[in-house]
Amino acid sequence: MVNSLDMNVIKYPIITDKATRLLANNQYSFIVSPKSDKPTIKAAIEYLFNVKVVKINTAHLPKKKKRIGQYLGWKAHYKKAIVTLSEGDTINLFAEEN
């Protein structure tokens, strides 16, 4: 069973050109909590979306310098997870309007 901490594992899906190309291979990209591990991510995805996860690839992406005018700041580091689902399972990321 998934506890309340697992609900904070998945932050939001990634919607980029590469992520939309991966949808053809039944792979979905998410920004996840930096301290989460693969079994926790798998349990959260299976609980939230009611699908079967086959494989998870994760990557820690570093912080980057960002400049806005004369001000220099940092874009925070984050963790990305690419989740491969079993055949026949899908996640509806885009809400369909009637």
Swiss-Prot record:
Localisation: Plastid, Chloroplast
Pfam families linked to this entry: Ribosomal_L23 (PF00276)
Domain of life where this protein originates: Eukaryota
Keywords assigned by UniProt, alphabetized: Chloroplast, Plastid, Ribonucleoprotein, Ribosomal protein, RNA-binding, rRNA-binding
Any one Gene Ontology BP term: translation
A GO MF label: structural constituent of ribosome
Major localization class: plastid
Binding partners and assembly: Part of the 50S ribosomal subunit.
Described purpose of this protein according to its UniProt entry: Binds to 23S rRNA.
NCBIfam families in the cross-refs: PRK05738.2-4, PRK05738.3-4
The protein, known as: Large ribosomal subunit protein uL23c
